[in-house]
């Protein structure tokens, strides 16, 4: 049933819910949820690349509207478009290449800078929006910005449309398939969408073999619910 679960995860373009997987392979939803989290942990294998050439970076916030949450998941003192109930994710994508995503604590310089330095080659040209969290990387990279606040989205080769397109795909999966991704497990969901993007040009069979070659990424049920 593990092989069936892996195949279904990799062949569904937008993801598969634990409820649907439980029906497809005839296990409980609790078991299906655990299997999905284990599989997503392995999908980290395609979320660790080194990005070169032209790279776009951008952050997004993941989280449903507070009014739509179950009572035990509502965030106190959260109103309107406040980000208190949302979790930031940083994305970096090499144009015509791969993407890397990391869940972050905040969108501050101290949080963003070391992650970009870890995954983006120093010789790369980096494109971002005008957010101040990227100011520090001017010291290490050729860094160009577009000012979304002033309605500027494209200035020649300076744009962040590629990474924003990736976020669109992630949000579609969030809204259409999963409905809720807890901050605790969000990195594993990000792994799934990152893997899917980075293997978009290869067959499902190749994806299947790639995952089986990376079962070193493991997590126990006790770790998941801790």
At which residue positions do the language-model features occur?
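Residue-level recognition of single "structural anchor" positions
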Residues: 1-226
């Amino acid at each position: 049933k593990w092989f069936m679960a892996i195949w279904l995860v990799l062949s569904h373009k937008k993801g598969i819910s634990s409820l649907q997987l439980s029906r497809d392979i005839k296990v409980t939803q609790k078991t299906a949820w655990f299997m999905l989290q284990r599989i997503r942990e392995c999908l980290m294998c395609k979320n660790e690349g080194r990005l070169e050439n032209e790279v776009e970076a951008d952050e997004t916030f993941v989280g449903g509207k507070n009014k739509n949450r179950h009572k035990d998941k509502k965030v106190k003192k959260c109103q309107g478009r406040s980000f208190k109930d949302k979790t930031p994710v940083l994305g970096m994508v090499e144009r015509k290449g791969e993407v890397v995503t990391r869940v972050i604590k905040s969108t501050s310089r101290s949080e963003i800078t070391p992650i970009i330095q870890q995954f983006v080659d120093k010789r790369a040209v980096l494109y971002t929006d005008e957010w101040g969290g990227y100011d520090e990387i001017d010291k290490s990279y050729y860094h160009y910005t577009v000012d979304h606040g002033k309605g500027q989205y494209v200035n020649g080769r300076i744009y962040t449309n590629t990474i924003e397109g990736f976020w669109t795909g992630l949000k579609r999966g969030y809204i259409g398939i999963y409905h809720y991704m807890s901050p605790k497990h969000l990195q594993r969901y990000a792994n799934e969408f990152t893997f899917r993007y980075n293997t978009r040009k290869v067959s499902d069979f190749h994806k299947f073999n790639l995952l089986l070659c990376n079962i070193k990424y493991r997590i126990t049920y006790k770790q998941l619910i801790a």
